[in-house]
Amino acid sequence: MKVERTVRRILPRATVVLVAASLAGLVAGAAMAQEMEPRAYSSAPLGTNFVAVAVGNTRGEILFDPSVPVTDVVADLNLASVGYARSYGLAGRQGLMSVGFAYARGDIEGEVFEEAQRIGRSGLGDMRARVSLNLLGPGTMTPAEFAKAPRRTIAGVSLTVQPPTGQYDPERLINLGTNRWGFKPEVGLSVPVGGWFLDAYASAWFFTVNDEFYPGEAARRQDPLASVQGHASYTFKSRAWVAFDATWYGGGESTVDDGEPSARQSSTRFGGTVSIPITARQSIKIAASTGASARTGSDFNTALLAWQFTWFDRPPARQP
């Protein structure tokens, strides 16, 4: 029963960072910066494991490089993803390692040389791996110690890596993979205020060159894409919690070979997240977001439903 109570206390705090990585290839990096994840730096006992499965839908406009004769493009994608995360300790500090995989299926329509076109795509997107470490806040704790620990301010850092593992055909203009590496360093702060957590993150995506861009021999380069996030989340006595989310991103100009650079992206998004415990070890998360303003850049509406299961490592048996 003590373990079950500890898990109940973890559920409103910890979360698996699930990624709809399939979108990254479609929007040239904009979807990466549009993601919003409240409580990404929450603490958890040493040896806590999380697995999550999610389904979702994303629909919105896609921005292409000016060298490509494609305009007024809209994508409607259904997504399925699975993720695993595990807490760890380093020099007495708490951290979290996670990995996520996504599959996408949907339709993309737009005008090619001013002629309406519609295509379908299905396959794996680029995977993602993330490692975070809390530099300020609670140190490593056992489940029993965690259950008694007060809430504290947390400051942490993380690195997300996206390798080119998704479906990619250089002779296709639209792909689910990106055929390049992406790296996102981030700093985060989480402050408890009464029943609330106030979170703020700052990050930037950096990209390698896609040297097999359409029609297969072009080189596509993209400048760093900066992003800031803010979240305000409240925990109820039932351990359910609700979050109000916001993000802004900017930058990410891209060029193909020596062609004209794309416009600098700039967009703001708002969203909401609800997490509901259904048993001591399981919870359901519902999230949605929409673009509030987008001077330039891809603009999406997203909806997500995720299931999460939590468990602890089995403690070593006592020696007789």
Please tell me what each predicted stretch does:
Residues 29-52, 137-153, 312-320:
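Outer-membrane beta-barrel biogenesis signature
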Residues 47, 74-80, 122-129, 153, ...:
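Residues that define the transmembrane beta-barrel architecture of outer-membrane proteins
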Residues 49, 61-62, 92-95, 138-139, ...:
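Repeated loop/turn-to-beta-strand initiation elements of outer-membrane beta-barrel proteins
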Residues 51-59, 97-105, 157-163, 200-206, ...:
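Transmembrane beta-barrel strands of outer-membrane/channel proteins
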Residues 105-221, 262-263:
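Outer-membrane pore/translocation modules
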Residues 107, 212, 217-320:
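Outer membrane beta-barrel transmembrane domains
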